[in-house]
Amino acid sequence: MTQSTEDTLLRLAAVIDSRKGGDPDQSYVSRLFHKGDDAVLKKIGEEATEVVLAAKDVRQGGAPTALVGEVADLWFHCLVMLSHFDLSPADVIGELERREGLSGIEEKALRKRREREENGG
């Protein structure tokens, strides 16, 4: 991820954050925030499903641009969800940086060990 990409995510997140107290009749994001957890989370599920379907379409000769558009929708709604739970893209970027260089197997083993330690085991 380039600094420019990170800046784009952070700028978009700032706009989303600014909608938290907004008028739900004037802003789609404000409306999602106003409807609460279930509406935000339902939207994530819908968008994730659309990504899966678009990816399958690409394998069947569909337009890759449709997949890119659906992933953009999912990322946008993930930013809304992060904001809704008082988190930011920086939190996710930090976690990805922490995992960088670890194999998936190593990362999963470390996560399980941390969970056992946190649960007193």
UniProtKB/Swiss-Prot annotation:
Q: What is its EC number?
A: 3.6.1.31
Q: Which residues form a coiled coil?
A: none
Q: Which organism is it from?
A: Burkholderia ambifaria (strain MC40-6)
Entry-linked CDD domains: NTP-PPase_HisIE_like
A biological-process GO annotation: L-histidine biosynthetic process
Q: In which pathway does it act?
A: Amino-acid biosynthesis; L-histidine biosynthesis; L-histidine from 5-phospho-alpha-D-ribose 1-diphosphate: step 2/9
**What's one Pfam family here?**
PRA-PH
The similarity comment for this entry is:
Belongs to the PRA-PH family.
Enzymatic class: hydrolase
Q: Keyword check for Ubl conjugation, yes or no.
A: no
Q: What is this protein called?
A: Phosphoribosyl-ATP pyrophosphatase
Q: What gene name does this entry carry?
A: hisE
Per the record, its GO cellular-component terms are: cytoplasm
Keyword Amino-acid biosynthesis tagged: yes
Task: Enumerate the catalysed reactions.
Answer: 1-(5-phospho-beta-D-ribosyl)-ATP + H2O = 1-(5-phospho-beta-D-ribosyl)-5'-AMP + diphosphate + H(+)
Which compartments does it reside in?
Cytoplasm
Sorted alphabetically, the keyword list is: Amino-acid biosynthesis, ATP-binding, Cytoplasm, Histidine biosynthesis, Hydrolase, Nucleotide-binding
> Taking the first listed entry, what is the main subcellular location of this protein, grouped into a coarse class?
cytoplasm
Please name the GO terms that the record assigns under molecular function.
Answer: ATP binding; phosphoribosyl-ATP diphosphatase activity
Which PANTHER family does the record associate with it? HISTIDINE BIOSYNTHESIS BIFUNCTIONAL PROTEIN (PTHR42945), HISTIDINE BIOSYNTHESIS BIFUNCTIONAL PROTEIN HISIE (PTHR42945:SF9)
